[in-house]
Structures are given as C-alpha cells and as structure tokens.
C-alpha cells in the first residue's frame, strides 16, 4: 500500500488561498472556528513567524515549488493571462519543482485544486493526477476545472469537491508500494465571499463581532479608494461572514481528508503540511486585499505573514510552537532533507532547511534571524526587531520598529536617529538579493504593478506587454463590493 514507513512518508501538502496568519484559531483568533487545524497544530508544530516570499498568490506559489525567489523564477505577479487554450503560457517552463525531485525518488504526485502558474490545461510532468482550477479564482459553485487535460465545470461547492478528489486519490494509492505526494490547493478563503458559502458555515458567524478585523479609515494607498470603502461599509459584515465561513468550510474539508488517511492506517506515515500562499487584510490597515491591495504594493505583516502547521504523529514533536523567522523559500530544502532525498549540488538556493526543527534538534545558533520578501520593485528585509521596506527606484521607503510598534503604524525612515539602522538593513537587503537574483528576471525593473502578469518576464523587452497597467473590470475590491464571481 502507500508508504507505511515513517522515514519515507507520504506527503499531504495543503495550501489555502489568501489566509493571513491572524485567521486561525490556534494562532490566537478566538472568533474564527478552525477545530481541525487547531488539532493538527496540537499534534505537530505551529510556526508563529512564517512569511510568504511575495504577498500575492502566483509568485508565492512558484517559490514554494521551486525554492527560488520571484526574481529567480520569474513569476512576479498573479497570473492574468496564459492559463488555458492556444495562448497558454507555462511560466515555470524548464525549472525544477519539488514535485520533480520527489517523483525522481519514487513518489507518485497529484495536484488537486489551484495551480495559477499558467498552462493549467496541460498536466505538469511527473503528476499522475491533475485536477486543476482553470485560472486561479472563480465561483465556489460551478467552478471551472481541468480534469487531467479536459475542461469541465464541476457541480457542488468547490471546497468539498476538492476534498472528495483528494480522498479519491488517496484511495487509489492505498494498494501501491510507492509513497504519494498530494498537493491539495484550496481556493478558499479567496473571494467571492458574499452569498458563496454553505449556510451551515455562514450561520456560525451570525453573532460574531469581528473584533479581529478592525474597522479602520481607508489606507491612503488603498486601490479601491475612499468611495469604495464608503460603498462597501454596509456590506463589511457580509464580507467577513463569507471570509470566515470559507475558512471554516475548508477546515472541515481538511478534516475529512485527514480522517480518511487515518482510516487507512496511514497517519503515522504521512507528513501533513498546511500553509497559505500569502496573507490578507480584511480591513487591517484600512485595506481589503494583500500586497496589491495598495499602490504601491505593501509589505505589512498582515500581507506577508501566513499560517504554517506541520505534523507527522510519532516523528514530529506534538504541541510545539516555533517562533523562528522562516519563509516560503525555506520549504523546498526542508522537505528534501526531511524526506531523506539527495540535494542538487548545482546553483545555490536562498532557503535554509529547518528539517532539524521538525525533528526537535535545532540549536539556538542555527535559528533563522531574518527573512526577505519582494513584490516587483518593492523589497523587504525583516528581523525580529526591525522591518525595512525599499521601493525602487526612489521610494517611498519604510522603517518599522517592531518591538515597540508591532502594528506598523509609525514609519521611522525619515528620522535621522535611525539612519544607521536604515543603512545597515538596506545594505543587508541589497547584498542578499544581489546573490540570488537572475538579472534577466529581476523584478526591480520589470514594471510590476500588482495588476497581473501577462507573459514571461523574458519577453519584457519585446513589443509584448508583460505586466498589466491597470486592473481588469472587477478589481479585488469591486468583487467584494459588487458580489461578482469572476474577473470579466
């Protein structure tokens, strides 16, 4: 059957969509209901300070798959063109993914859910199952999917459909000798939120105060602007009910998959990884959105900090909370090491393996003390005490003293008392990115706006437009306000 060896475990790799670290019960939010994920954390390790590599879906997901930063793999914004059909674009063509590595060591790989890296209608090499969302967002009922290479519209609530597909895949693997790798990528809790989720879950929040989602004045850089906030004020509560319900429905769906794995006797030989692609602001900082919820793009912790839980009963310590600063680019080397696979001796990747943490044997000297982030011309370096955000070519830049200003309210970058801090952090940021950037894919000079990627960055010098200059008819905030189901 599928692997029963704890040292060569199956992998269930679950990624949620637009879920901030604040949107998790075991993360300290007493309003949101996530009992399954809370139990998963109680049986494994919850990572308190885990950061995406870019605060928007496609580049963050590409980094999880490749172990590279956006300015190396070339995906700098959410994929707006090239998902299906004759004009499909494989944005990761020629690059080695973590699934390629594990497949080379005998794993049978499956994708169930969101891909959003182009060419969704062509199964990626080394996948034995490919049930992918056609684009990257859409309605929760009647979702457009690709079943292997066949387009289809699925009936039912997509969160449940994906869980059913995951269970079906595991069932098909139970009598095989090889271990499996199952990427279960939910579209939840990405919008649409209003009138989009089962009543059983929206009813959970009828009496919720939503104190975890502050009502703040609109951020001056908010892409929706003040009129949008004013129009949407009356629907704020309905939006939050939908967002919270989407998380809880996903939590229940994950529970069904975990119960099935347990029923087959595979729990102790299955590594479960749960995280989100990027964070999300639901009114935090006066923003509805993530990194591209403002122009210029932002790097607030609510945008870049994501939930992360890793569990394998009997091997990973139970009930631990790790507070090291870790990033999406650390996942690739960590999984390679944890699974006991051979490392590629080629080009150095930016990530540091935290596999020793999973085995409970990391020393203080080995702990990560800094993380980096990028979104086109916006780059961030963050320590436990300071965050510096640099926007090329000439600002506005930001410096936050996180020890005394965890909410990132007071920008100190113009205060001469902190000149040395800024100089040191900027030098550190520039040196690190210089080491890992591919000059042909450097996001600093590609014109990334937060409005979507239309082509591979290698074509930036041609006559083709690579990055959108403005949102489609129906930007993030339009969908929230007007209850649209898809981008038109």
Language model feature labels by segment:
Residues 34-35, 64, 114, 123, ...:
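Polar, surface-exposed loop/tail segments
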Residues 2-9, 16-32, 55, 134-329, ...:
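Active-site-proximal cap/lid insertion segments
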């Amino acid at each position: 059957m599928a692997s029963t060896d704890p040292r060569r475990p199956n992998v269930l790799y679950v990624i949620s969509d637009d879920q901030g670290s604040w949107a998790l019960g075991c993360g300290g939010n007493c309003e949101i209901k996530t009992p399954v994920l809370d139990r998963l954390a109680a049986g494994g390790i919850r990572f308190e300070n885990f950061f995406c590599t870019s605060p928007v879906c496609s580049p963050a997901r590409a980094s999880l798959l490749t172990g590279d930063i956006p300015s190396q793999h070339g995906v700098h914004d959410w994929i707006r063109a090239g998902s299906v059909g004759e004009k499909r674009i494989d944005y990761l063509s020629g690059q080695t993914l973590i699934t390629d590595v594990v497949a080379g060591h005998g794993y049978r790989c499956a994708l169930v859910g969101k891909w959003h890296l182009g060419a969704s209608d062509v199964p990626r090499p080394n996948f034995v199952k490919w049930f992918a969302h056609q684009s990257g967002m859409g309605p929760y009922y009647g979702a457009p999917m690709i079943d292997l290479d066949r387009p289809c519209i699925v009936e039912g609530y997509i969160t449940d459909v994906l869980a059913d597909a995951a269970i079906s895949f595991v069932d098909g693997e139970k009598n095989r000798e090889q271990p499996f790798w199952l990427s279960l990528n939910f579209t939840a809790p990405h919008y649409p939120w209003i009138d989009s989720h089962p009543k059983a879950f929206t009813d959970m929040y009828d009496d919720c105060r939503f104190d975890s989602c502050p009502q703040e004045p609109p951020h001056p850089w908010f892409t929706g602007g003040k009129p949008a906030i004013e129009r949407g004020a009356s629907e704020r509560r309905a939006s939050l009910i939908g967002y919270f319900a989407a998380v809880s429905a996903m939590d229940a769906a994950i529970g069904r998959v975990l119960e099935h794995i347990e029923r087959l006797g595979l729990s102790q030989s299955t590594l479960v990884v749960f995280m989100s692609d990027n964070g999300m602001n639901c009114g935090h900082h006066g923003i509805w959105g993530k990194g591209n919820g403002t122009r210029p793009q932002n790097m607030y912790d609510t945008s870049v900090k994501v939930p992360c839980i890793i569990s394998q009963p009997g091997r990973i310590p139970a009930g631990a909370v790790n507070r090291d600063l870790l990033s999406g680019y650390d996942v690739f080397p960590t999984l390679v090491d944890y699974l006991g696979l051979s490392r590629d001796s080629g080009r150095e990747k930016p990530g540091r393996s935290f596999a020793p943490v999973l085995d409970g044997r990391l020393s203080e000297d080995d702990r990560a003390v800094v993380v980096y982030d990028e979104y086109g011309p916006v780059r961030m370096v963050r320590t436990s005490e300071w965050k510096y955000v640099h926007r090329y070519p000439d600002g506005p830049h930001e410096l936050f003293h996180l020890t005394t200003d965890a909410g990132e309210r007071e920008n100190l970058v113009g205060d001469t008392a902190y000149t040395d801090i800024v100089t040191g952090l900027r030098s550190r940021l520039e040196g690190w990115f210089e080491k890992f950037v591919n000059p042909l894919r450097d996001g600093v000079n590609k014109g990334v706006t937060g409005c979507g990627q239309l082509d591979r960055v290698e074509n930036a010098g041609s006559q083709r437009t690579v990055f959108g200059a403005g949102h489609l008819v129906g930007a993030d905030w339009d969908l929230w306000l007007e209850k649209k189901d898809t981008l038109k």
